């Protein structure tokens, strides 16, 4: 069996400028634990997971915001709405990158190895630079359960 046999084809993805608040709502609504972040051509550029939503400390967020405020405010008039938006992180701010991906022909054994080696829970399936599916650990477990029992010799 390969990725194409077990992958979820209806992939929920987000753009890099999607606010994290919207991503959190999407994860809850769709009952998923992570989404690929795609560029304008549909190519994966990162992943955002539940861990990214809760794993960043307040100090990290404040340090990032302070850096941007200092950089932008030095001698330049800055749009107040833009400054306010800096307190709302986007997918670009929080995603894990670069994205690790596979193709449709990747075997289930290889996928399991990739998930284990990189300590990730899902991997996008890419064809011609675009996401065509996603394989999660749950997909691998379903495939394992669906296999016919082979009696011991």
Describe every region a protein language model picked out:
Residues 1-153:
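Tandem CBS (Cystathionine beta-synthase) repeat/Bateman regulatory domains
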């Amino acid at each position: 069996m390969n990725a194409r046999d077990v992958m979820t084809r209806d992939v929920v993805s987000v753009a890099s400028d999607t606010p994290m608040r919207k991503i959190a709502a999407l994860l809850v609504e769709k009952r998923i634990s992570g989404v690929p972040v795609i560029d304008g051509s549909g190519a994966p550029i990162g992943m955002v997971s539940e861990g990214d939503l809760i794993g960043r400390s307040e100090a990290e967020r404040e340090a990032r915001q302070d850096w941007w405020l200092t950089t932008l405010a030095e001698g330049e008039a800055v749009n107040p709405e833009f400054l306010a938006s800096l307190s709302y992180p986007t997918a670009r701010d929080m995603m894990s990158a670069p994205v690790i991906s596979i193709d449709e022909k990747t075997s289930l054994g290889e996928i399991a190895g990739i998930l284990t080696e990189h300590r990730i829970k899902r991997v996008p399936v890419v064809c011609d630079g675009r996401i065509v599916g996603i394989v999660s650990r749950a997909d691998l477990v379903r495939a394992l359960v669906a296999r016919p029992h082979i009696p011991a010799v």
